[in-house]
Amino acid sequence: MENTIGTPTLWCSFGVFLIIIIIIEMSIQKIFVYKESAFKIALYSSCISMLTAILFDVLIWIYIKFTVNSYLANINFLTFISGYLLEQSLSMDNVAMWFFLFQLFSISMVHQRVILFYGTFLALVFRSSIIFFGVWLLSKWSFLFYVLSIILLFTGIITILSNGVNKKTDVQNTFIMSWIYKKFRITKNFSKNNFFTKENGVIVATPLFLVLILIELNDIIFSIDSIPAIFLITKDPFIIITSSFFSIIGLRSIYVILANSIQKFYIIKYGITLILIFISIKILLKEFVDIPIMLSSFFIVCILVACFIIEKFFFQVKSKN
């Protein structure tokens, strides 16, 4: 394993940057829920997150340049940027999954903010644990790949047949969900922003808790693909953790941008569903067909771009005529 550049000074600096960006993110995300310009605010938030990551990378470059040499500073500067951009690109399917889960369980925008608030911190904990202890710890949970992919494939097909993700798919009354609600004492009723509530004197979990667990499982499962990809760039835990953390925090804003775009456009709803079906098939065939991570990310980006182009140049022209 390579020697790490993570000195106490850099780790402390990272902690300060992390606290600052979390405060900024939480403040902005609290505003967007109650504003009509959610899309624009999310764009600002995404830009701030990216600029903060770049500023931190510049700090790394300056520190290494004056404590070691310019060559090592340049190498680590480019490595951090590469890891950050790679994590962002590989998280597209993760963000799409968030939207799909929120739609399936009819989670309001206010409740989405609560779930993503706690989900972000849990994702940071899980991600750092995976990096430190290795992906092999998740090998005994490999069955989750297939459970999640079957659910994705099933709900994706139903969504297409029911005319897009904008139409609510009644997952609450399916056999699988009814069994989960009964087995794990989960109520179908929301209780403000609470993850747990009391019914008939018994403490039960709310749908918010169920969706939070599903989102965290989703993040753990997809991180098995993304983290090894970052290890191909560098094995320095400091670079891996810092670039991953900055990327994860910025995903909330990316989700808001995606969610608002889907609400405004018609075709992209089918594009997201197609992406989720592709992800499920990719997971199911993982043992037989090895689809490269970058190829998968390229496919997802192409689908989204194609949907926007079709929406802009076909449906808008058609509506004018």
Swiss-Prot record:
The keyword Cell membrane applies. InterPro entries: Integral_membrane_TerC (IPR005496). Disulfide bonds: none annotated. The chain crosses the membrane at residues 10-28, 41-63, 94-111, 116-138, 143-165, 200-222, 237-259, 266-283, 293-315. Pfam families: TerC. It is a multi-pass membrane protein. It is found in: Cell membrane. Keywords: Cell membrane, Membrane, Transmembrane, Transmembrane helix. The keyword Cell membrane applies. It comes from Buchnera aphidicola subsp. Baizongia pistaciae (strain Bp). Belongs to the TerC family. This is Uncharacterized membrane protein bbp_156. One of its GO terms (cellular component) is plasma membrane. Coiled coil: none annotated.
